[in-house]
Amino acid sequence: MAMTAEVKDELSRLVVTHVSCRKAEVSSLLRFAGGLHIVGGRVVVEAEVDLGSTARRLRREIFDLFTYSADVHVLSAGGLRKSSRYIVRVAKEGEALARQTGLLDLRGRPVRGLPAQVVGGSVADAEAAWRGAFLAHGSLTEPGRSSALEVSCPGPEAALALVGAARRLGISAKAREVRGTDRVVIRDGEAIGALLTRMGAQDTRLVWEERRMRREVRATANRLANFDDANLRRSARAAVAAAARVERALDILGDEVPDHLAAAGHLRVEHRQASLEELGQLADPPMTKDAVAGRIRRLLSMADRKAKETGIPDTESAVTADLLDDA
């Protein structure tokens, strides 16, 4: 089951006892999943959701809290619909339900944001508002670089109201318009986890956090492996380049090279992958790595100086692109 469906399934089974919270959830769910329609001169309230368990929960709460009966209609998958959709409809008492849930104000005008009783309610009501909004049009992506919890909103006013509800819960959310749709988005992993718990999806949070931790460990391991590989490649290329320059230096100087410099040069050529410290230990008598580096540096400098005086290619000419590609 995808993460979004897991969250919605858990929220649909959540038992809520406080009446104000139950009403806030219903109001939010109807606001974010529904619409008001005029059919035969009467107001009809509709809400379209993607899980049968959500539709059953909404129908039950509408009856328990407001004593109104709701019908549930199933739109089967097919055509552009990848999965079944469920429409909860209240026709006979639609206007009364719309007024009691805050979809209509006292003058009978549609409320664009969240109802005043939800916006000004308790922190628990803010949690319920988020629960209803997520059940209506929420989504949660798998943990990763672009993980996000977001809710599609019916308009900018509803989006801003949801951002305000998140702020009351100590969670930072952002409202933005994406391809003509207003959305509220949370990207921070800690904030996503906190909101899942606040809404009542603690079990799904644990699963999400486990996947998140596993992905972070895997990403860290990959970064370290790539770092080590890059360092090894750089070290190998540097060793090949150094040996090639030393070989060229010995060719340029011939018999003119001092014995102590020649000895250091031959060590470098014969032990291409050895570190300077290891070369020093191989020397007879042993030397420090600084002494080895100094002798090789003087050998190259002497050879480059002679190459310049005689007009022949210097030691750098031995380091070709093909040579480094083969390293």
Swiss-Prot record:
Question: Please, which domain of life does this record's source organism belong to?
Answer: Bacteria
Does this UniProt record's set of keywords contain Transcription?
no
Annotated GO molecular function terms are:
DNA binding
Q: Which NCBIfam families match?
A: DNA_bind_WhiA
Name the segments for region: Disordered.
Answer: 306-327
What is the documented function of this protein?
Answer: Involved in cell division and chromosome segregation.
Q: Which UniProt keywords apply?
A: Cell cycle, Cell division, DNA-binding
Protein name, entry field: Probable cell division protein WhiA
* DNA-binding region coordinates: 275-308
Q: Tell me the protein family, please.
A: Belongs to the WhiA family.
Which InterPro entries does the UniProt record give? Homing_endonucl, Sporu_reg_WhiA_N_dom, Sporulation_regulator_WhiA, Sporulation_regulator_WhiA_C, WhiA_LAGLIDADG_dom
**One Pfam family named in its UniProt record:** HTH_WhiA
Organism annotation: Rhodococcus opacus (strain B4)
List GO BP terms, alphabetically.
Answer: cell division; regulation of sporulation
